[in-house]
Amino acid sequence: MKRILSFFLTLVLTAALLCPAALAVNETAAKDRDWVYITLDPGHGGDGAGGNDSGAVNEKYGYQEADLVLKIGLYLKEELETYRNVHVDMTRSDSYGTRYTPLREVKQRVDFAAEQCSDLLVSLHLNSAGSNQSVHGGLILASNGNYDPDCAKVIDAVGTNILAQLSRLGIDTSRGLVKEGSHDGTTYPNGKLADYYGIVRYGQLRHIPAMIVEHCFVSSNSDCEQFLSSDAKLRAIAQADARGIAAYYGLEKKDPGEVDVEPLFRDCRSHWAKDYVNTLYFTGVLTGSAAPRTRAGSTVWEAACSSRTARSRAPCS
């Protein structure tokens, strides 16, 4: 089927190339594969319908996890966008939240990342040990890799980089990467033990590297004083996260005034039919929406580059 479709597209492409507009394809084709799409998920917060989950709360200072991780998320988005070829989406960008952030449900957060064709989902949190003041420091909740080991490897690598950067701020990261299996025997479709944490588990099922960054303990007065007590300190945490992510993907800072040009259709930027699809779009043979995905309104597109089919069946690359 792929060979037949490729032959058909080649015929259409040959005709389309006679149009000068097709030359624009060459300007973006080489860059498309270099783009990184990241979804940030500030944990807890509003559900988009008036409900709210504050997350963990520090009894002495009154700091609420949901508020602090939102600030970290906004700072992190800002910092990541100083790098070339990075697009950042957020499950929520305010305290009210969205339909993707319902209370006590996390699947929708992963669904959102999948809809954005994300290469990485980073869920931002602060830990809590209740009244135990001796517990402090950061860790990352990663995957056991029982369903999609390739995605798990990405989590391990990005997570290790982030922890190294948080450690430079003075945060105790000795707990490292934590991989916790299901407590009740829940398994993945392949019969292997599933991950315990929903963000990580649903990420595995959607073939998206998804991790939870517990930056430090909001229940710890010491951690609050050292790392959470000002916007400058929250920004420093966000910048540490960004450096860790950038190190894994090999990101480079933009030059002053530099403007990125995103791929036409983010869901097929690494697909074998990408160049065909871009050319057909430029020449008017194929119509669609450039952000974030094409609209499957043409037989060519549905056959060549259907994101929902490709993303649901293909592991991380």
Question: How does the language model describe each region?
Answer:
Residues 14, 41, 141, 214, ...:
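Residue-level detector of conserved, well-ordered beta-strand and adjacent loop positions
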Residues 24-38, 60-63, 67-259:
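Active-site-proximal helix/loop segments of hydrolytic enzymes
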Residues 47-52, 221-222, 287-289:
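Short, solvent-exposed loop/turn elements at domain surfaces
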Residues 35-62:
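Short glycine-rich His-centered loop
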Residues 3-24:
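Sec-dependent N-terminal signal peptides of Gram-positive bacterial secreted proteins and lipoproteins
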Residues 259-316:
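Extracytoplasmic Gram-positive cell-surface binding/anchoring modules and repeats
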